[in-house]
């Protein structure tokens, strides 16, 4: 038996906590026997004193074990359970292609996803732009879809890592969100509750990233790889670029449309293709579905070329109560905005810089995201045909096409786009899409 205040005191004085002390505290958060003040105090001591790697692993495992941990053994699946987690960005629609692509190659992806947060789009919000799409199937149905289709993308239920929800809510109001051990535990508790064999982390870098600097993004990626492997899940991370919108579109229905076009081969944005392929390669290698990069890429290209990946996406949509012919007739089902019109730069030039975060916030302002949890989303709004860094723009080539609910909203969005995109006389040097791979 421990006392919460003694655990706080020990950490306050700079000592490492034991696994038992951490589990006691986290179970108390779940059971409401630890007060909000005590959670805040421990969070602040961790913020200032950091945690050792064993402490980080213990914290993550305790938070994972505060609720249900999925177990897939009874399904006798003939492939690995793998998933991807992204720290979030703008136009980051990789999950919608990656899940079906890896499933078509023999993996099983029980993806528990989130809603939009701040300027970043949420995978669940995107999928809910598909009529009827059910993001909360019951446990048995979730398992059936994984067994039959190979991939399902669902929302987090209250039974998964419940301690994290309360811990995060307190961190949010006490300026302790940006602590690497706490971020690591929060992300991984939910992911490891999926019962994974392997995980790949997509840690964004740049103006639209969650972490403000390259160094902090790198530190987070290294922490996650260290902790997840310490918890027994094969994990690698990629540092990928978010200095511009990743896809050609940003929003909800517009990104789903781009995902379908990507899978069918109708249109593939080259940067989106690079990042999606790189993440899929990691999943195939970590999941032992491919021995090396070349074999993984060949398998992934094959399921894109032969239509298998698109077929898996269609089956997932149908299994989650969406239209059975969605891939073939997506244009018929996805909502369209009242006003669709291009915005042009005031001068000619080359796109040299993009405030990706501001573009994400512009989508939120148009109604494509939430300012508070109770807000409803307008799934039809957003941007398409986004100019990329290095593109030449003028009176013929727009900065973006804006999908808005009315003229007033379009004008506000146009102002935001012009302010967020800087032009120069010559094209900037191109930046990589993937900066670095981090493994144990």
Curated annotation (Swiss-Prot):
Any single GO CC term annotated in Swiss-Prot or TrEMBL for this entry: cytosol
Catalysed reaction, written as an equation: thymidine + phosphate = 2-deoxy-alpha-D-ribose 1-phosphate + thymine
Segments crossing the lipid bilayer: none
A Pfam short name: PYNP_C
Protein's GO biological process: pyrimidine nucleobase metabolic process; thymidine metabolic process
GO function terms (MF aspect): 1,4-alpha-oligoglucan phosphorylase activity; thymidine phosphorylase activity
InterPro entries attached to this UniProt entry: Glycosyl_Trfase_fam3 (IPR000312), Glycosyl_Trfase_fam3_N_dom (IPR017459), Glycosyl_Trfase_fam3_N_dom_sf (IPR036320), Nuc_phospho_transferase (IPR035902), PYNP-like_C_sf (IPR036566), PYNP_C (IPR013102), Pyrmidine_PPas_bac/euk (IPR018090), Pyrmidine_PPase_CS (IPR017872)
Keyword terms of this UniProt record: Glycosyltransferase, Transferase
Pathway: Pyrimidine metabolism; dTMP biosynthesis via salvage pathway; dTMP from thymine: step 1/2
Major enzyme class: transferase
Enzyme Commission number(s): 2.4.2.4
Similarity field: Belongs to the thymidine/pyrimidine-nucleoside phosphorylase family.
Subunit-level organization: Homodimer.
Protein's job: The enzymes which catalyze the reversible phosphorolysis of pyrimidine nucleosides are involved in the degradation of these compounds and in their utilization as carbon and energy sources, or in the rescue of pyrimidine bases for nucleotide synthesis.
Name of the protein: Thymidine phosphorylase
Biological source species: Escherichia coli O139:H28 (strain E24377A / ETEC)
């Amino acid at each position: 038996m421990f006392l919460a205040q003694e655990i706080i005191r020990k950490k306050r004085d700079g000592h490492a906590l034991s696994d038992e002390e951490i589990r006691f505290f986290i179970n108390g958060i779940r059971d409401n026997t630890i007060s909000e003040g005590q959670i805040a105090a421990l969070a602040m001591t961790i913020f200032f004193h950091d945690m050792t790697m064993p402490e980080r692993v213990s914290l993550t495992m305790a938070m994972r074990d505060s609720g249900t941990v999925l177990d897939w053994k009874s399904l006798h699946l003939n492939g690995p359970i793998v998933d991807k987690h992204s720290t979030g960005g703008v136009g980051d629609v990789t999950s919608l292609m990656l899940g079906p692509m890896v499933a078509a190659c023999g993996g099983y992806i029980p993806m528990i996803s989130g809603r939009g947060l701040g300027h970043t789009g949420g995978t669940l919000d995107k999928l809910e732009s598909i009529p009827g799409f059910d993001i909360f199937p019951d446990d048995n149905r979730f398992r059936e879809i994984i067994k039959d289709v190979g991939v399902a993308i669902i929302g987090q239920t209250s039974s998964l890592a419940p301690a994290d929800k309360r811990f995060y809510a307190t961190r949010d109001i006490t300026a302790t969100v940006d602590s690497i051990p706490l971020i690591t535990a929060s992300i991984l508790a939910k992911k490891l509750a999926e019962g994974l064999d392997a995980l790949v982390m997509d840690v964004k870098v740049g103006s639209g990233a969650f972490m403000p600097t390259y160094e902090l993004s790198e530190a987070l990626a290294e922490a996650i790889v260290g902790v997840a492997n310490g918890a027994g899940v094969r994990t690698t991370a990629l540092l990928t670029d978010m200095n511009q919108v990743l896809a050609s579109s940003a929003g909800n229905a517009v990104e789903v449309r781009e995902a379908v076009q990507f899978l069918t081969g109708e249109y593939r944005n080259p940067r989106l293709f690079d990042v999606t392929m790189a993440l899929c390669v990691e999943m195939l290698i970590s999941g032992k579905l491919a021995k090396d990069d070349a074999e993984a890429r060949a398998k992934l290209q094959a399921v894109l070329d032969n239509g298998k990946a698109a077929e898996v996406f269609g089956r997932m949509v149908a299994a989650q109560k969406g239209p059975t012919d969605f891939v073939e007739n997506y244009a018929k089902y996805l909502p369209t905005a009242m006003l669709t019109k291009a915005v042009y730069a005031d001068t000619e030039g080359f796109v040299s810089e993009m405030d990706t975060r501001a573009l994400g916030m512009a989508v939120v302002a148009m109604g494509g995201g939430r300012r508070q949890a109770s807000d409803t989303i307008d799934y039809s709004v957003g941007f398409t045909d986004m100019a990329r860094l290095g593109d030449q723009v003028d009176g013929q080539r727009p900065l973006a096409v804006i999908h808005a609910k009315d003229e007033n909203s379009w004008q506000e969005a146009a102002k935001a786009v012009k302010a967020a995109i800087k032009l120069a006389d010559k094209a900037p040097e191109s930046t990589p899409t993937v900066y670095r791979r981090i493994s144990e």
